[in-house]
Amino acid sequence: MTWTVIFTVKAERDLAKLPDDIAKRIILKIETIAENDPYDQLDRMTNSPYYKFRVGVYRGIVNIVNDKMILQLVRARHRSQVCEPHLVKT
């Protein structure tokens, strides 16, 4: 089953600030994750309800809404910035 992918406003802003090729790779990656079981491809963040994935040195932060089969991209940033706790609040 395919999951639905949605983007938060902050994630859309993050993607707009990234180089075009990186933003496209992040979007392609989350769409690929949505086609399969996301739990096999995402890592849970420590002490957080969110999950993460890597695209080179960039990270995507994802919220999974199980009952509706939705993957919500919360943030997409360089790895040095994305794991700061205040950045993943929606």
Regions found by a protein language model. Name each.
Residues 2-4, 17, 21-24, 55, ...:
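Enriched for short, Lys/Arg-rich terminal
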Residues 15-18, 33:
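Hydrophobic recognition helices of helix-based DNA-binding modules
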Residues 29-54:
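A short, surface-exposed loop/turn module that caps and links secondary-structure elements
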